[in-house]
Design a protein with these regions (language model features):
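Leucine-rich repeat
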Residues: 61-75, 79-86, 90-319, 329
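Short, solvent-exposed loop/turn at the beta-strand->alpha-helix junction
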Residues: 203-209, 233-238, 259-264, 284-289, ...
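A structural signal for leucine-rich repeat
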Residues: 242-247, 266-274, 291-299, 315-323, ...
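CRL adaptor-proximal regions
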Residues: 2-18, 34-113, 554, 558-560
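C-terminal closing repeat unit and adjoining cap/tail of repeat-based domains
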Residues: 67-77, 444-560
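Conserved hydrophobic position(s) of the canonical leucine-rich repeat
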Residues: 192, 223, 250, 275-278, ...
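Solvent-exposed loop/turn tips at the surfaces of repeat/solenoid architectures
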Residues: 200, 231, 253-258, 278-283, ...
Length: 560
């Protein structure tokens, strides 16, 4: 290989530490949680376009798959799901650069002189197709890729290779990529750092047999991260192979538009002993017993994520001594009970949809039991949720006793509706359950009466979707006058309600601070922002909620 390499193929997320070599030291593992999230309002906009459970689970043959309305519905759902998935471990979009220096012995193959461990490290940072091509460089390189830890993505094996998970792949392209995956799994000895299989249908009989072979290969060859995303036509009535539970090296697992393996009858040893992150995106399960089984058999699980509709809606019981973050985004669940999760600091429930026509009416019940480490909770919405703390149902006018308080929570996000009288009455009772809150995020609200966390602890208030209505201004006025510790007030304007942020800022300042001395909470800094809309509004990603290097994942909207 002529020349001296001074650049390398870059990726959005290096796989260096995820593909260890035998002797060479690996650089510190970069956090896999690197993508920005969106405000809850923009997340709701994206989520509202997600297809309904009926349209997704409807058996779709070749004729129905051509239905333009069904295709559009599934495409929107896939687009929403894909935004929740982790970034690729390696990239086909990186650049490879080199320079030739005659003074430094140009033309001499210096890379081939490196130890095998370092060469395997080089190959492991390449997409599978490029990694295989290194065998053609010289005799020295031929055996390297066969023993290098690989990142295998079928999207990289498409004729038009891409990092993105495509919402539509032609049958010919999907078959070609699947054939390439089969060849790689047959000849490569492993290990596989990551396998992302997302470009083909997994429901047809031939595809199911092929998937079973793939999973067997990956289990034997120690895959560490696995993403399985089904493509239309979707049926969801056939279970994934139970081979999934033989992948004992798995640390991260994401499934989308698939039916979870039946857990009844699995051998006693079936488990995910190293699994740290599990994401279920529009997945069908036999019932809450399957989820209970997964939690019980995943002793290292730290992050649990739900995106899109679960079939059927789950009764989620959180019993885990390892869980640190649970996120539920636009997913219908009947209830979320934190039964025993002593190490859980984050519970994020966003945009859970209301019951649709023909469904049993009622809210998703959120019960907080043994969660002494819980520090962040939101977005709670009384139109969608009912709250229970211990054995106490929290309703408007509830006299909150010590047993109904969660003093560990420091960051709280709420969604209250000014024009709904019951919401306005509910807010004071709800806030009294969280007496130590320091950072409060509100999507429309109303209140009254003395509240400990408001008076003594809240330092930051972020108010989303401000429209300038009298009820909104009255709430902000109450809050500013009551909150003795308030340091920053951030008002995020709803799109199209003001000609400029200056107009909105003037209206807020006039209502809150006009004629008042700069004393007490009047010293709080006011920041008025314009809400991002449309394509400029980033989508909520689980990577942000699970990134513990960020003290407050909701704070992305607040400039620091």
């Amino acid at each position: 290989m002529a020349g001296q390499v001074v650049g390398s193929r870059n990726s959005r997320r290096s796989s260096a530490a995820r593909c260890p070599t035998s002797t060479a030291p690996s650089p510190p593992r970069p956090s896999p949680l690197t993508t920005a999230a969106s405000a809850s309002s923009s997340a709701r906009t994206a989520a509202s376009s997600t297809a309904s459970p009926t349209s997704i689970t409807r058996p779709t043959g070749r004729g129905s798959a051509r239905d333009p309305h069904l295709i559009a519905s599934i495409s929107r759902a896939l687009s929403t799901i894909h935004r929740a998935l982790p970034s690729p471990a390696v990239s086909v979009e990186g650049r490879l650069s080199c320079t030739v220096s005659d003074s430094d012995g140009g033309g001499v193959d210096r890379l081939s002189a490196l130890p095998d461990a370092l060469l395997r490290g080089v190959v492991s940072r390449l997409p599978a197709k490029d990694a295989a091509r290194t065998a053609a460089l010289s005799r020295r390189w031929r055996p390297v890729w066969l023993s290098a830890p690989l990142v295998l993505s079928d999207a990289h094996l498409l004729p038009a290779a891409t990092d993105a998970i495509p919402s539509h792949v032609s049958r010919a392209d999907a078959d070609a990529a699947a054939a390439a995956v089969s060849r790689v799994l047959a000849v490569h000895d492993g290990p596989f750092c990551c396998a992302s299989l997302a470009c083909g249908n997994m429901d047809e009989d031939r595809a199911r047999a092929r998937l079973a072979r793939w999973l067997q290969h990956l289990a034997v060859k120690g895959v560490e991260e696995l993403l399985l995303i089904n493509q239309p036509p979707l049926q969801l009535h056939k279970h994934l192979p139970a081979t999934l539970f033989s992948m004992t090296a798995l640390t991260r697992l994401y499934l989308s538009f698939l039916r979870f393996p039946a857990t009844a009858g699995l051998p006693r040893g079936a488990a995910f002993p190293r699994l740290r992150e599990l994401g279920l995106c529009s997945v069908a399960m036999g019932g809450h017993e399957d989820m209970d089984f997964v939690l019980a058999r995943s002793p290292a699980l730290e992050a649990l994520c739900f995106e899109g509709h679960m079939f059927p809606p789950l009764r989620l019981r959180l019993v885990s001594r390892s869980l640190r973050c649970v996120q539920i985004h636009y997913s219908k669940v009947k209830s979320v009970a934190v039964v025993d999760a002593p190490c859980l600091p984050r519970l994020i429930v966003m945009n859970t949809p209301l019951r649709g026509e023909g469904e049993v009416e009622g809210s998703c019940r959120i019960k907080i039991g043994n969660a002494p480490s819980l520090q962040l909770f939101g977005y709670f919405d009384p139109a969608r949720h009912a709250l229970q703390v211990g054995n106490n149902d929290i309703k408007a006018g509830t006299l909150v006793s010590a047993g109904a308080m969660v003093p560990s929570v420091k960051i709280l996000a709420l969604e209250f509706h000014f024009r709904v009288r019951s919401d306005a009455k509910m807010l004071p009772s709800f806030l009294r359950c969280f007496p130590s809150v320091e950072r409060l995020y509100i999507q429309q609200a109303a209140s009254g009466a003395a509240i400990e966390c408001v008076e003594l602890h809240v330092k930051l208030l972020v108010f989303h979707d401000f429209r300038g209505e009298k009820a909104e201004l009255a709430f902000l006025q109450f809050f500013v006058e009551s909150a003795r510790a308030l340091e920053r007030l951030v008002v995020v304007c709803a799109g199209g309600c003001f000609a400029s942020t200056d107009e909105a800022s003037s209206k807020v300042r006039k209502a809150l601070f006009a004629g008042k001395k700069e004393t007490g909470s009047g010293r709080c800094a006011l920041l008025v922002l314009e809400n991002a809309t449309g394509k400029d509004a980033p989508a909520w990603k689980y990577e942000r909620g699970s990134d513990f290097s960020r003290a407050d994942p909701f704070a992305f909207i607040v400039p620091t």
